[in-house]
Curated annotation (Swiss-Prot):
Cellular component, GO annotation: cytosol
Locations listed in the record: Cytoplasm
SUPFAM superfamilies registered for this protein in UniProt: Pyrrolidone carboxyl peptidase (pyroglutamate aminopeptidase)
BP GO terms, sorted: proteolysis
Catalytic site: 80, 143, 167
Enzyme class (EC, first level): hydrolase
Chief location of this protein within or outside the cell: cytoplasm
Family note: Belongs to the peptidase C15 family.
One Pfam family recorded for the sequence: Peptidase_C15
Species this protein is from: Streptomyces coelicolor (strain ATCC BAA-471 / A3(2) / M145)
Protein name: Pyrrolidone-carboxylate peptidase
Self-association state and partner proteins as the record states: Homotetramer.
EC number(s) per entry: 3.4.19.3
InterPro entries found in the cross-reference section: Peptidase_C15, Peptidase_C15-like, Peptidase_C15-like_sf, PGP-I_bact-type, PGPEP1_Cys_AS, PGPEP1_Glu_AS
């Protein structure tokens, strides 16, 4: 049975909830067939988030890791193609830290690509009826910090792992006036189950050869 670690973040930026953790918890409570899923909540703090991720990987010894974060304003689940080696925080993290133009890992490579089949994951979510897309930027806040940091952990400490990052939209309770896109965490979790099933059966090098690019 494939062992999966799925992570979400604590609320940040004045929010009372974080839909990434809500969805991760739902997936762990009702995992896809053939997968053993454990969920871990990461602090929305530079540095500490990667320490918590490393500890969770060591504790659970997963085969596959999916880290989640909140991307308010995006209309669907977006699977990140790449994490880049820069922290450039527009707002402080939950500990008050606000690094500007600092590397996630000093002297690390410029970027790490996801080792999940990002296009197959997107296709699986769409087939499950959940809006999804490939994203080419995870931002430069703690989400990208973890997306890049996970790639570095895989490259340097856990070479048996495959892993990647996905962003989820706001939950409806975060936009009660309906002025921005939102998805219920249960809907997101339904899509993530399809994503994980696709990731477990599809090596990254056998990803779908379909267009999911962007012109800008």
């Amino acid at each position: 049975m494939t062992r999966v670690l799925i992570t979400g973040f604590a609320p940040f930026g004045g929010e009372r909830v974080n839909p990434s953790w809500q969805a991760a918890s739902l997936v762990a409570a009702e995992p896809p067939a053939g997968l053993a899923v454990t969920a871990a909540e990461l602090p929305c703090v530079f540095g500490e988030s990667l320490d918590a991720l490393r500890d969770a990987i060591r504790a659970d010894n997963p085969d596959l890791v999916l880290c989640l974060g909140q991307a308010g304003g995006r209309p669907g689940v977006t699977v990140e193609r790449v994490g880049i080696n820069v922290d450039d925080a527009r707002i402080p993290d939950n500990a008050g830290g606000q690094p500007i133009d600092e590397p996630v890992v000093p002297d690390g490579p410029a970027a790490y690509f996801s080792t999940l089949p990002v296009k197959a994951c997107v296709a699986a979510m769409r087939e499950a009826g959940v809006p999804a897309a490939v994203s080419n930027t995870a931002g430069t806040f703690v989400c990208n910090h973890v997306a890049y940091g996970l790639g570095h952990l895989i490259a340097t400490e856990f070479p048996h792992l495959r892993g990647g990052f996905a962003h989820v939209p706001w939950a409806p309770e975060q936009v009660p006036d309906g002025t921005a896109p939102a998805l219920p965490p249960a809907t997101v979790a339904h899509g993530l189950r399809a994503l994980l099933a696709a990731a477990a059966r599809t090596p990254a090098e056998q990803d779908l050869k379909v267009t999911e690019g962007a012109t800008h």
